[in-house]
Amino acid sequence: MAPVSKADKKAAVDAAAWMFNVVTSVGIIIVNKALMATYGYSFATTLTGLHFATTTLMTLVLRCLGYIQPSHLPFTELLRFILFANFSIVGMNVSLMWNSVGFYQIAKLSMIPVSCLLEMVFDKIRYSRDTKLSIGLVLVGVGVCTVTDVSVNTKGFVAAFVAVWSTALQQYYVHYLQRKYSLNSFNLLGHTAPAQAATLLVVGPFLDYWLTEKRVDMYDYNLVSVLFITLSCTIAIGTNLSQFICIGRFTAVSFQVLGHMKTILVLIMGFFFFGREGLNLHVVVGMIIAVLGMIWYGNASSKPGGKERRNYSLPTTRQQKLGAASDSDDNEDKA
């Protein structure tokens, strides 16, 4: 039997990481939709805080088992990341409340150009013409699928602007911190999850009350709703971990482009489980365009010159690089 090459092994791990993210992301969307629409649990920010609290417990278990090794992340970097991440969560929730669904979807699509800009400015990344065109094709396809009514107001635009930039910065920072401080996905999540859990569980109930005029402590918790909350938190562990793994192995732009496959899958599963309402020709055409764009992007960005860094490297030491290479591969292969 021929030995498996390093490239083949990397491709297999990349595919596994991506499938892990797709399955957990689509799963948590469906569970949260049932929790909020069927059982009336409309406290999205508090629920996210519970997600990170559960993820924190997972990182503590992994630390005890030896999967997470001691590592260092400066407090200023952690604080900056938490600000970006929490503004992203709050901004998305507020944007959805203040904007039409159509403008909310356009705002989400604009994260790809913003992520491209961040990589071009900070990482000196250069994209080929085919890579740029493939990204555009994905945006067109997903836009055709999801964008319907589009109305804009000032406060909604501000909320969307904050949400888009903070989300793009948070995802860029995941990749940046892993490279600069030689942190694998487990290490970084071990640093960030406790801080996000603490801040969101403090801010979340007040923000949710402002958005919904309902108090989280007055919700009618019953066995079924608690089971759904528990299931949502359990799946969120995989969602949070797989996001860090994917962005660490790829880039924020690739994560965003390929991430729209989840949008397509959610639409398809929605039609499958909840009937054919909304399934029409332009939605099907949009799905086909988006998938073709993703295939084109994967091919174009992998070619020489498709996406390359121009003589730029982060200030990591040789010792950090050697330690990160072995530690990251070992831990993420185990995941």
From Swiss-Prot:
Region (Disordered) location: 303-335
InterPro entries assigned: Sugar_P_trans_dom, TPT_transporter
One GO CC term, this protein: plasma membrane
Membrane topology, as annotated: Multi-pass membrane protein
Coarse class of the protein's main subcellular location: Golgi
Subcellular location: Golgi apparatus membrane
GO molecular function: antiporter activity; transmembrane transporter activity
Top-level taxonomic group: Eukaryota
Family (UniProt): Belongs to the TPT transporter family. TPT (TC 2.A.7.9) subfamily.
Role noted for this protein: Nucleotide-sugar transporter that transports UDP-rhamnose or UDP-galactose and UMP in a strict counter-exchange mode.
Protein name, entry field: UDP-rhamnose/UDP-galactose transporter 6
Biological source species: Arabidopsis thaliana (Mouse-ear cress)
Upper classification of the organism: Eukaryota, Viridiplantae, Streptophyta, Embryophyta, Tracheophyta
